[in-house]
């Protein structure tokens, strides 16, 4: 499954989610016990598979879609389902295109989608279902209650994973203060962060299908995962192995490698360590590492990112930063006496809180 195909499917599912005019029209067709074949988009590729019918070019409405579905033939909408372009057209895709569908309407929908790269919606009269075809993929729309049940289960799982992520992140912060961090400690946080992101993506897919009926879940989800992506990026900036002359490597490369790990590989901490630029060996997990200080500085209030970068660049590592006095901090460009005192006090409070959280 390509990323582009995944994005296109999400876009179409958002268009047919509860609360949209298109979903209202589809439900009217189902209740009326009639079938329908609806193409989203029109260009030269569609012209090649269309025969007959008549042009309309009128504004879309659920009632118009329902009435037009009573006629034989397919309905052509514009790509955003804002206009009804054609009705009662015959679709004649290439019959040699492979398809696993059996019904005439669904076979046609699948082949038109594959040939034209346009989404096609098939409403089945006999099975009373709505199937969406995008780039050779098929997705059957489900009742909101079923999707909501699965979304709630996934959200409960996400809450447990997020709680565990908070625990290991707090432990890592305390270890950073004491300067006793190992590669294993870093990889555990990265692993948990990636797990949270993946479940977040799964819940997001459910929310797309729920449309307006998923608003409360969306608020819970956004609150639950707030800051996770930023913390993941700061972790990579803190521990990414510097690039060698032979191999250019940046934070984005490391994050992409983490994102590309399979579910099985993500459980292997050595594979996670490789995303940070460490050798893919079990021995490296016990190697000591020193953070640069991005994670801790990001928790100091009212400190711009550009100042964070300058402070990290000046001191070169968290131990030297924690040992720095107010006068030392003032040597950094853009850090005056007031800001230096704020940074010094903020770091001291964070250090005390991190150690207390670990041992209390």
What residue spans do the PLM features occupy?
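Divalent-cation
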Residues: 1-262
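Long, highly charged, low-complexity intrinsically disordered interaction regions
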Residues: 230-332, 337-360
């Amino acid at each position: 499954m390509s990323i582009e195909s995944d994005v296109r499917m999400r876009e179409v599912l958002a268009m047919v989610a509860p609360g949209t005019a298109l979903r209202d029209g589809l439900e009217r067709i189902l209740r009326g016990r009639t079938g329908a074949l609806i193409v989203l988009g029109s260009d030269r590729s569609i012209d090649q598979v269309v025969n007959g019918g008549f042009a309309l070019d009128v504004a879309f409405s659920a009632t118009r879609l329902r009435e037009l579905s009573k006629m034989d033939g397919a309905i052509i909408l514009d790509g955003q389902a804002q206009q009804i372009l054609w009705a009662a057209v015959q679709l004649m895709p290439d019959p040699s295109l492979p398809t696993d569908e059996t019904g005439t309407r669904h076979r046609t929908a699948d082949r038109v989608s594959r040939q034209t790269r346009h989404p096609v919606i098939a409403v089945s009269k006999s099975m009373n279902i709505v199937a969406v075809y995008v780039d050779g993929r098929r997705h059957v729309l489900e009742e909101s209650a079923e999707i909501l049940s699965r979304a709630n289960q996934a959200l409960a799982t996400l809450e447990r994973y997020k709680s565990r992520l908070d625990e290991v992140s707090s432990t890592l912060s305390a270890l950073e203060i004491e300067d006793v961090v190992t590669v294993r400690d870093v990889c555990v946080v990265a692993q948990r962060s990636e797990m949270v992101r993946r479940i977040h993506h799964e819940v997001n897919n459910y929310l797309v299908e729920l449309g307006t009926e998923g608003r409360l879940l969306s608020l819970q989800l956004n609150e639950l995962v707030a800051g996770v992506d930023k913390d993941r990026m700061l972790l990579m900036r803190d521990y990414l192995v510097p690039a060698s002359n032979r191999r250019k490597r940046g934070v984005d490369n490391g994050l992409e490698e983490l994102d590309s790990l399979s579910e099985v590989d993500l459980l292997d901490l050595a594979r996670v360590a490789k995303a940070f630029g460490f050798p893919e060996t079990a021995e490296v997990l016990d190697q000591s590492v020193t953070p640069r200080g991005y994670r801790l500085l990001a928790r100091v209030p009212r400190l711009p990112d550009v100042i964070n970068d300058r402070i990290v660049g000046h001191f070169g590592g968290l131990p030297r930063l924690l040992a720095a006095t107010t006068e030392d901090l003032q040597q950094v460009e853009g850090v005056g006496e007031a800001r230096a005192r704020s940074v010094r006090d903020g770091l001291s409070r964070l250090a005390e809180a991190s150690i207390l959280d670990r041992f209390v």
